[in-house]
Amino acid sequence: MAKITKTFQYGKHTVTLETGEVARQANGAVIVKMDDTVLLVTVVAAKTAREGQDFFPLTVDYQEKFYAGGRIPGSFFKREGRATEKETLISRLIDRPIRPLFPEDYKNEVQIIAMVMSLDPEIDGDIPAMIGASAALSLAGIPFKGPIGAAKIGYNDGQYILNPTVSELKKSQLELVVAGTANAVLMVESEAALLSEEVMLGAVIFGHREMQKVIQVIDSLTAEAGTQPSDWVPPAKNDALVIALKEVIGGRLSDAFHIRDKLQRRDAIAAVKDDVIQQLAGRLEVEGWNLAELLKEFGELEYRTMRDALLDTKVRIDGRSLEAVRPITVKVGVLPRVHGSGLFTRGETQAIVVTTLGTARDGQVIDAVTGEYKENFLFHYNFPPYSVGECGRFGVPKRREIGHGRLARRGVLAVMPSLDEFPYTIRVVSEITESNGSSSMASVCGSSLALMDAGVPVKAPVAGIAMGLVKEGERFVVLSDILGDEDHLGDMDFKVAGTSEGVSALQMDIKIEGITEEIMRQALQQAKVGRLHILGEMDKALAAPRAELSDYAPRLLTIKIHPDKIRDVIGKGGSTIQAITKDTGTQIDIQDDGTIIIASVNNAAAREAKCRIEQITSDVEPGRIYEGKVAKIMDFGAFVTILPGKDGLVHVSQISSERVERVGDKLKEGDVVRVKVLEVDKQGRIRLSIKAVEEEVASI
């Protein structure tokens, strides 16, 4: 195939799609250029599914090559290693809108690889990667119901910005990524500076309208490339098996879905499934039916049973109304030795969240393609297998945990103090101890409580809620505070976090087309009502940050010195600062602008270190009397230390009003004496006098 190129303007940027020249053995390959940011995105699909495959094995890997930014990796091996958190998050960003566009019965393995090969520091690789994945999938000749478009939206001074640069995002009140087909929004990921629901919805609509040009260009590219439609045909539905299944099940699935306890409901459904398999075992062999097919159809009946009951009765699995939030209990200060903690329970979802305060040096150094930077607000989310009553792998966080942690972090970021206002590194850890839906939003609520318990001056409490949707034709219901089953069997997962004033984070994943603006507006308004209710429950336990930090948290004292005096504080080979930290047990950070931060759990120790630094950096005043220690005896006088790092000479003639034959007769090293500063010359040499002090005292 000859090289094909398509170019279009997208916001301020020029986007080019190229295919037919590079990676020609992949099913689909596209080079995407957005100004100087260049990615190669490839798609390879297996010709057949593996025997017994019962899920769709789609993998997405996004990688930023260090050479893209003209850098060599800083690791020992000097090559790219395992995926960074950013790479994992962008991989998920690509995956989420394309996964629903494959047929349910398609089980062939599909792998998407997006490599950033040139990176303009002002243009991130996420949107080009999503566009490239959509184009490569469309060229691959597989049953993909795309293409999709993707756009990043900023908001400033009442105006939406299409695909803002990195610099523009720093000033923006919003960073929102939206992806979808020509007719439907499929995915939204965002963080916001407490914006209204209307502004958030407007950004989604604006982004979906603008991305249409991406979809049109990809359609044009695939048409010119002559991509043939996929010849994959879904397996025919086994009507006889479905009828037999319904006869054996009867009303037992419906009865099981009326059980309100999650584990009891799960056990009841499993018992029905086991009984069905046992009863139909003979017919499976006689009719030549497949067990995997039976299990698939059983899952389909689960799906239909729950959804039909919801639409018909407007009553949830656990007996709640559509808008009701599960019972909430809140506790703070649940762990005695940590800096801040909260226990947040909502129904059968529970999180213990802990806040730890550290100094600036505790921040995480990120070695990125564009250079190193330090992150001083860390949020870690852990989802152990026991939280859902299962055995499983424990330890290294999976992609889902990284994604949920980032969403929860976005939820509270808008209310966090700046490093200037609160110069601590803050680490929040959410331990999910029970889960039945919306654990990431429980993490938002728990983190708000833990931060306030730690005394972090957040601007306002934050809460989060997960919304769901069940839609059949024109009938639909929007669900507040969804359960795990409602998430799994529903059509939308819509998470909203914010304060009483506005939205701080919004994440949306939609599995079907036909979600209208009105449905999204209803979901946002219903989420606001739920969020305000949750905030009210949280306020009963703790409504504002504590006035004092934990006894076990480090206290920070900040002083400012002239940058020229930094070398005096550090001392020769670091001797002075090492002596201060060793003597006082404090941790001291010195910044280039002369800002010094002293950290210690002991307030008195911090004040002592501050006093010593002030002494070192203070100027010696002629005419002032100091108390000093004799540092060295010489034939012509004695050197006395009057301030740390500042020695002056008491000449033999200035030791006493009497004649002194030998300095050692009057002074010894280590003696503490009072001296008056006679002069500080141009070279900084200090002349001292003991005699002048005695004369001054005698005259009083």
From Swiss-Prot:
EC nos: 2.7.7.8
Annotated catalysed reactions: RNA(n+1) + phosphate = RNA(n) + a ribonucleoside 5'-diphosphate
Domain spans labelled KH: 554-613
Species lineage: Bacteria, Pseudomonadati, Pseudomonadota, Gammaproteobacteria, Lysobacterales
Taxonomy, superkingdom: Bacteria
Cofactor: Mg(2+)
InterPro entries registered for this protein in UniProt: ExoRNase_PH_dom1, ExoRNase_PH_dom2, ExoRNase_PH_dom2_sf, KH_dom, KH_dom_type_1, KH_dom_type_1_sf, NA-bd_OB-fold, PNPase
Protein name as it appears in the record: Polyribonucleotide nucleotidyltransferase
Gene3D superfamilies with a match to the protein in the record: GHMP Kinase, N-terminal domain, K Homology domain, type 1, Nucleic acid-binding proteins
Subcellular location: Cytoplasm
